[in-house]
C-alpha cells in the first residue's frame, strides 16, 4: 500500500507540500512546529491519496528543512517577536514561556528571548 511508487509522484507530492508552505508563509510567520501541523492537515484535506503518517511527515520535514536553509522559517526570530508581542499585551514571563513551549519553540530560544526582555525592562512582569 505504498502510494509513492515512482520518483515523479514523490516530486509532485513534495512540490504540492512546498506550495502549501509558501502560501501559508505569505500570510503568517509560524514556528516550525506550527507549519508542520498546518501542512499535515492541509495535505490530508486536499489529497485523497492514502499516505502513511510517517511518510507524510518525512515529506513535510524535507520541505521544512529547505525553508530553514533559505531562512524563511526561523524559530529564534519567532521567539523574539512573539515574546515582544506578548509582553506588550501584558502577559507574564511564565505565561510567555508556556505559550512558546506550546508553539514548539526550543528551550534555548525561549531562555534567550526572555533574558533579552529582562535586560531591557526593569520589571517585565509589570510592563
Language-model features and meaning:
Residues 1-127:
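An alpha-helical, amphipathic repeat domain used for nucleic-acid recognition
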Amino acid at each position: 500500500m505504498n502510494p509513492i511508487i515512482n520518483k515523479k509522484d514523490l516530486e509532485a507530492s513534495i512540490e504540492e507540500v512546498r506550495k502549501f508552505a509558501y502560501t501559508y508563509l505569505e500570510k503568517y510567520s509560524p514556528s516550525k512546529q506550527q507549519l508542520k501541523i498546518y501542512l499535515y492537515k492541509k495535505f490530508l484535506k486536499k489529497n485523497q491519496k492514502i499516505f502513511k503518517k510517517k511518510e507524510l511527515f518525512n515529506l513535510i520535514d524535507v520541505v521544512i528543512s529547505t525553508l530553514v536553509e533559505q531562512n524563511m522559517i526561523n524559530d529564534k526570530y519567532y521567539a523574539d517577536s512573539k515574546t515582544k508581542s506578548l509582553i506588550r499585551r501584558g502577559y507574564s514571563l511564565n505565561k510567555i514561556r508556556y505559550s512558546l513551549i506550546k508553539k514548539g519553540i526550543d528551550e534555548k530560544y525561549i531562555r534567550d528571548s526572555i533574558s533579552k526582555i529582562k535586560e531591557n525592562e526593569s520589571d517585565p512582569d509589570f510592563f
